[in-house]
């Protein structure tokens, strides 16, 4: 569709995100809603956002900013955390990047997305999205058929404790 192609050329959106966040929490034994899990999630998201912006800025320095850059808040030095009243961890690093973005622009208008989809998560063997796992045992229905999914971290723990058997 021409309008979609024109919009993509003008705004150049991409969607980078985190995959396996719940898996990391299981491995680290962090309850999903714990302070440790929240802090880790924040650090991961901040790093993804920082390096996505930095890379997009590098591409803008090489190829020019996306054509709608001057219409964005980023052109005024406003980034997502500014819009939500969130303080980044290393303000000096962020201030330097903001100044660079104001000077050079960004190659992409959108950088971050909530990922992955259920299908991609199943392919790579991780839990989907950034939400907590819905159940330790569930049936996934796809076009290829039905699949029983069991929490592999629970199985590992039960095996470690000598509690995993055919009856479970």
Predicted regions and their residues:
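Long, C-terminal-biased catalytic regions of enzyme "large/alpha" subunits
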Residues: 1-168
């Amino acid at each position: 569709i021409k309008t979609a192609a024109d919009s993509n050329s003008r705004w150049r959106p991409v969607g980078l995100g985190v995959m396996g966040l719940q898996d990391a929490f299981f491995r680290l034994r962090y309850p999903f809603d714990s302070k440790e899990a929240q802090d880790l999630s924040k650090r991961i998201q901040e790093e993804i956002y920082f390096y996505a912006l930095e890379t997009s800025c590098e591409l803008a320095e090489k190829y020019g900013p996306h054509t709608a850059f001057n219409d964005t808040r980023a052109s005024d030095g406003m980034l997502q955390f500014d819009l939500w009243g969130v303080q980044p961890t290393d303000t000096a690093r962020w201030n330097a990047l903001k100044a660079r973005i104001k000077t050079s622009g960004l190659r992409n208008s959108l950088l971050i997305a909530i990922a992955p989809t259920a299908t991609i998560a199943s392919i790579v063997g991780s839990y989907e999205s950034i939400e907590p796992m819905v159940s330790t045992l569930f049936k996934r229905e796809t076009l290829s058929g039905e699949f029983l999914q069991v929490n592999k971290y629970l199985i590992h723990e039960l095996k470690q404790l000598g509690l995993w058997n055919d009856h479970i």
